[in-house]
Amino acid sequence: MENEITKLIDEVKQFTIDRDWDQFHNPKDLAIALSIEASELLEAFLWKSPEDAKTEKIKEELADVINYALLLADKCGLDVAAIVREKMIRNAKKYPVDKAKGVATKYTEL
């Protein structure tokens, strides 16, 4: 899996290098772009039931979100697999199965 993540990062980086876009990719602007793409993902669901959302639009916007997240992590020198695992460990402590299973309650209210 980690090898696949590294390959994806390399592919996305090469895409931007080939177009000389890397000069525009600083952490601030990548975070802003990620947020904008996340909003476009939300737009796929706006005024629709979840079942009516268009799968192709979701795939397109989700790919943009992931691409910017990968670029941001790389630009900040972060290991994507490691930070996801670290966050899952923190989440497991905040949301123990015996208290959080089947409920949508925030950890501060469990």
Q: What are these model-derived regions, one by one?
A:
Residues 1-110:
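Flexible "arm" and connector segments at domain edges
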